[in-house]
Amino acid sequence: MCIRDSITDDIDRGYGHVLCTHTGLVVAYGAVVFDGEPAYAEIDGTWLDQAPYVVLHRLAVAQEVKGQGIATEFMRRTMTLARERGTGSFRIDTNFDNRCMLRLLAKFGFVRCGEIHYAGDPRIAFQKIL
C-alpha cells in the first residue's frame, strides 16, 4: 500500500491526526491507533506489559517547520490523548536508521523492547508506560 492509500485508510478509520499552527496550517500528521497493532503480537523481545496501548504510525512533520519541536509536541499530545482515554501504555516502531525518531523516543524515555516486522520489514519496537 502506498503512503497516500495508508493515510486515506487512516482517515477512514478515524486514526489520522494533524497538528496545526494557530493560523490553521497543518504542520504534522500521524496515525494514532487505539485498536492495537497486529504486527506487535509477535516480537523478538518482550513488551513491558500486556495492557491496552496506543500506537503512533506515520509521524511526518512539514519540511518548513522541522527542528522547531513539532514532533515533540505531537508526541506530547498523543500521550495526553492516551491518558485521557485511560490508556497507560504507548508502543511505537521505527526503522533502524531513522535517527530523528530514535532521538525523539530517547528524549521521551521509551524502552527498546525488541524487533517486530511491520509491512514485511524488520523494525525496532519501543514502549513507554504512561
Ranges and model annotations:
Residues 31-58, 66:
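Conserved acyl-donor/pantetheine-binding loop and adjacent beta-alpha core of acyl/acetyltransferases
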Residues 58-61, 67-80, 103-107:
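Conserved acetyl-CoA-binding loop-helix of GNAT-fold acetyltransferases
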Residues 34, 93-94, 106-125:
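Conserved catalytic-core motifs of GNAT/GCN5-like acyltransferases
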Residues 13-30:
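Conserved beta-hairpin
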Residues 1-5:
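Conserved small/polar residues in nucleotide/adenosyl-binding loops
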Residues 8-12:
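Short loop/turn motifs at secondary-structure junctions and domain boundaries
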Residues 72, 84, 96-114:
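Conserved active-site alpha-helix within GNAT-family acetyltransferase domains
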Residues 75, 82-95:
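Conserved GNAT acetyl-CoA-binding A-motif
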